[in-house]
């Protein structure tokens, strides 16, 4: 066969996977239908449990130097109270980053090529080549329309939630939940930030954080039921949300929107069976969730790491282990994401716990670490830790 692996999709799951396989001695072909550098719809945010992988791969300094500001703190504004914390480090890395995808993906592609992978952009995969029930290659065409066939021991779909590869192999979906939000964002100048800010309200979430070129991304998330009025007047819908946040609104009024609005609507939640005879899936192709918790790139990096390890091992047992490890790592965040995306009111005891965190910086930092992936939700919400938080709050009130 021509290649050990063909990776279809060259963004934040596919390029790191191709890089790691090439570093492991594999002959790898990486293809993507897009031309690069190019942007794509994205939540942008990489939690520190994702940036730690960039460090491990030797890429964190390059992403830093691209102009994406580091963030070590997150500010959660619930209206009645505010919690601001610094998530604990993940393997020594505390910072989160939110690079523009045209910049990040180009860095990842360049490193894959430098590691030995072959890369073809503007290459459209049309079908898979099968032999005796096993995937053995791809058929597609390049930018000039020339039809090309390439063969490999394994074909990996890293081509997003609507993965063509997943469709062609009929990868089984499970634990599915429909999309329940609409998320729109754009970029503003004149709004300097050095933290990620979230404003959580009953029927909307506003998020703002710095990205490349001195710009700040502002995103608005609404329940899907609000889609039609929101889509009919995006500018008005954003400013209506800002009006409910007076201090933030004043800062936005002094800033300037520099680009059009981008949107993600009713993004589905699902797991897919991530491997079979001659094929595998990585990133959003194998596991997808609502963008409200901004876990996509962190999960894509994780999949690249775990799947590369499994493919380099080469055994069916290693691929089965990849699925189990992916699912175990995703389980708590998946449930948390679905709950937040439902916009269902939190139970009173949950809000009481958050309110009790006020003034307890150590526990605020640990709570912020749940989203960041550096603190276990099970440990934070254990009966022992909850009792400690409530007792500390009661003691502070008496004092």
Question: Which positions does each model-derived feature cover?
Answer:
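Beta1/beta-strand and adjacent pyrophosphate-binding region of the FAD-binding site
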Residues: 1-13
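FAD/FMN-dependent oxidoreductases across multiple families
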Residues: 66, 229-311, 316-321
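Glycine-rich FAD pyrophosphate-binding loop
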Residues: 8, 22-42
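C-terminal helical "tail/cap" subdomain of flavin- and related membrane-associated enzymes
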Residues: 309-399
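Conserved N-terminal glycine-rich FAD pyrophosphate-binding loop of Rossmann-like flavoproteins
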Residues: 35-55
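Predominantly flavin-linked oxidoreductase catalytic cores and closely associated redox partners
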Residues: 111-248
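A conserved beta-strand/loop capping segment in the N-terminal third of enzymes
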Residues: 55-106
């Amino acid at each position: 066969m021509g290649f050990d692996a063909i990776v279809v999709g060259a963004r934040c799951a596919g390029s790191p996977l191709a890089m790691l396989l090439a570093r492991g001695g594999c002959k790898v072909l990486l293809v993507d239908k897009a031309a690069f550098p190019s942007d794509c719809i994205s939540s942008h945010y990489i939690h520190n449990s994702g940036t730690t992988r960039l460090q491990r791969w030797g890429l964190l300094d390059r992403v830093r130097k691209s102009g994406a500001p580091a963030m070590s703190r997150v500010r959660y504004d619930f209206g009645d109270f505010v919690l601001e914390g610094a998530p604990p480090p993940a393997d020594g890395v505390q910072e989160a980053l939110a690079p523009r995808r045209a910049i990040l993906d180009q860095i990842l592609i360049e490193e894959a090529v430098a590691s030995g992978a072959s890369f073809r952009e503007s290459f459209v995969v049309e079908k898979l080549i099968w032999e005796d029930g096993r995937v053995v290659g791809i058929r597609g065409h390049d930018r000039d329309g020339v039809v090309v066939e390439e063969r490999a021991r394994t074909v990996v779909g890293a081509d997003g939630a609507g993965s063509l590869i997943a469709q062609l192999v009929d990868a089984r979906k499970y634990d599915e939940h429909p999309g329940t939000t609409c998320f729109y964002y754009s970029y503003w100048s004149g709004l300097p930030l050095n933290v990620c800010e979230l404003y959580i309200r009953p029927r909307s979430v506003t998020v703002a954080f710095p990205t490349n070129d001195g710009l700040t991304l502002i995103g608005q998330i609404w329940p899907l039921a609000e889609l039609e009025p929101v889509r009919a007047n995006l500018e008005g819908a954003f400013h209506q949300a800002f009006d409910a946040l007076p201090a933030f609104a004043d800062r936005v009024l002094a800033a300037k929107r520099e680009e059009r609005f981008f949107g993600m609507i009713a993004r589905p939640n699902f797991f897919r069976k991530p491997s079979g005879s001659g094929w595998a899936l990585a990133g959003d192709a194998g596991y997808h969730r609502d963008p409200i918790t901004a876990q996509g790139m962190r999960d894509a990096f994780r999949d690249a790491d775990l799947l590369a390890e499994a493919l380099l091992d080469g055994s069916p047992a290693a691929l089965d282990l990849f699925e189990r490890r992916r699912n175990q790592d995703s389980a708590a965040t998946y449930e948390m994401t679905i709950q937040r995306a439902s916009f269902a009111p939190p139970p009173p005891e949950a809000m009481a716990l958050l309110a009790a965190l006020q003034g307890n910086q150590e526990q605020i930092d640990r709570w912020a670490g749940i989203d960041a992936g550096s603190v276990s939700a099970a440990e934070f919400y254990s009966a022992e830790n909850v009792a400690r938080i409530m007792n500390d709050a009661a003691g502070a009130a008496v004092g």
